[in-house]
UniProtKB/Swiss-Prot annotation:
This is tRNA-2-methylthio-N(6)-dimethylallyladenosine synthase. Belongs to the methylthiotransferase family. MiaB subfamily. It comes from Picosynechococcus sp. (strain ATCC 27264 / PCC 7002 / PR-6). It catalyses: N(6)-dimethylallyladenosine(37) in tRNA + (sulfur carrier)-SH + AH2 + 2 S-adenosyl-L-methionine = 2-methylsulfanyl-N(6)-dimethylallyladenosine(37) in tRNA + (sulfur carrier)-H + 5'-deoxyadenosine + L-methionine + A + S-adenosyl-L-homocysteine + 2 H(+). The gene is miaB. Its cofactor is [4Fe-4S] cluster. Binds 2 [4Fe-4S] clusters. One cluster is coordinated with 3 cysteines and an exchangeable S-adenosyl-L-methionine. [4Fe-4S] cluster 1 binds at C14, C50, C84. Keywords: 4Fe-4S, Cytoplasm, Iron, Iron-sulfur, Metal-binding, S-adenosyl-L-methionine, Transferase, tRNA processing.
């Protein structure tokens, strides 16, 4: 009996990449492949790549080098690079790693079977041309059985001076609401409890779809989508990410307050607290507008959890401008903040500027920001102490098998004693006994919110 071919996928980068990997895994399993955790036992190895940070890109090349050596000993190994590095580098990847069989940009994720058939025909395939994204044609192999990502808009029409995403993920392409709802209904039937709607700029959803309302706004918006999918049977929680401050409206905020399944957690990157830096980044808003958005959210939902992204040491950033970022972080008080020192990316305007800052300055500013972030997150966490929170149980605590772990509506990771086989996928009322900067510990109270 022939042994089934095994595949392995390593994913770098954002939630969009993780969702793409799940879809590609689903295609491979429909083709008869079996998943293996070991990339060196696999017959097909796929690296789904990210270009946002240079260190992630260099790690990909390191992994590829090892697999290229392996392919010399195992010629039937299929070696694939997908995602943003594939899109950006294209055929030049073949010169660097001639052992590659397939190079495919993120727009081609749903075409994996067709592309592999071309590879099996003896071709080295490079698929990076812009296309209209093929609607989901397979069931993704989800990494979780409790929570799931659902893409609602692909691509990005912004042109931030530091970012490669528009060049590698293409222009915005929104899915129609009917397709999104159908995918969520299938997830509900399969027992999933939480869905995160995904987009590079998710609050730009629907701008590219036809039609306007009598009031003159787009017929399809993220706000309308939330109302449309809110009653999907079986889905208990809805989240969305990532939001752009330019498109985050009070109408959207009001909908989130009105719709009980929509969690009070908002991920809205600000990138810098200084208006001159924001202008150089070409972000299209001021720090005053960003503050108004957060104030409006908190006026509707005082307990809302806010997370964001920030970049320090952008080209030309002065000490005073950096301190404006510290001031914004101190005054807003984020529940979580993803921070990074500026990393010049090939093909972006900012990478060509001659006012780059030193690695020493980058390291110093990142350390100072991270110290403040941890301090503010710890302060924000204290509001949970002694409260009862609804926690959706996702898995066992890998560091303590007697505990399960899940997330509150505010997206705070929470641990408590319990049996995973009994509690996985259930929403449990948990009294918080310990509040740390980025996680909570508690005790289950008797009532289960949902069975």
């Amino acid at each position: 009996m022939t042994k089934p071919r095994q595949y392995h996928i390593t994913t770098f980068g954002c939630q969009m990449n993780k969702a793409d990997s799940e879809r590609m895994a689903g295609i491979l399993e429909e083709m008869g492949y079996h998943f293996t955790e070991d990339p060196y036992a696999a017959d097909l190895v796929l690296y789904n790549t990210c270009t946002i940070r240079d260190n992630a890109e260099q790690k990909v090349y390191s992994y590829l080098g090892r697999q290229a050596k392996r392919k010399q000993e195992k010629p039937d190994l299929t070696l694939i690079v997908a995602g943003c590095v594939a899109q950006q580098e294209g055929e030049s990847l073949l010169r660097r790693v001639p052992e590659l069989d397939l190079i495919m940009g993120p727009q081609h994720a749903n075409r994996l079977q067709d592309l592999l058939e071309q590879v099996e025909g003896g071709s080295q395939v490079v698929a990076t041309e812009p296309i209209h994204i093929v609607e989901d044609i397979t069931k993704p192999r989800r990494d979780s059985t409790v929570t799931a990502w659902v893409n609602v808009i692909y691509g990005c029409n912004e042109h931030c001076t530091y970012c490669v995403v528009p060049g590698v993920r293409g222009t915005e392409q929104s899915r129609y609401p009917e397709a999104i709802r159908a995918e969520m209904e299938e997830l509900g039937r399969q027992g999933f409890k939480e869905v995160t709607l995904l987009g590079q700029n998710i609050d730009a959803y629907g701008r590219d779809l036809p039609g306007t309302t009598p009031e003159g706004r787009n017929k399809y918006t993220l706000t309308d989508l939330l109302y449309y999918v809110h009653d999907v049977p079986g889905i208990e929680r809805i989240r969305f990410a990532t939001s752009h401050p330019r498109y985050f409206t009070e109408r959207l905020i009001k909908a989130c307050q009105e719709l009980p399944k929509v969690c009070e957690h908002f991920h809205i990157p600000f990138q810098s607290g200084d208006n001159e830096v924001l202008k150089a980044m070409r972000r299209g808003y001021t720090h005053e507008k960003y503050r108004r958005i957060i104030n409006t959210i908190r006026s509707y939902m005082p307990d809302a959890s806010i997370s964001a992204d920030a970049i320090v040491a952008f080209p030309g950033e002065t000490e005073e401008q950096f301190e404006n970022t510290l001031k914004l972080v101190d005054e807003i008080g984020f529940d979580q903040l993803n921070t990074a020192a500026y990393s010049p990316r090939p093909g972006t305007p900012a990478a060509t500027w001659d006012n780059q800052l030193s690695e020493e300055v980058k390291g110093d500013r990142l350390q100072r920001l991270n110290h403040l972030v941890a301090q503010k997150a710890a302060e924000r966490s204290q509001r949970y102490a002694g409260r009862i929170e609804e926690v959706l149980v996702e898995d066992q605590n890998p560091k303590n098998p007697s505990q399960v772990m899940g997330r509150t509506r505010g997206n705070r990771l929470t641990f408590f004693e319990g049996e995973i086989n009994e509690l996985k996928g259930k929403i449990v009322a948990v009294k918080i006994t310990e509040a740390r900067a980025f996680s909570l510990t508690g005790e289950a109270v008797e009532a289960l919110v949902t069975a």
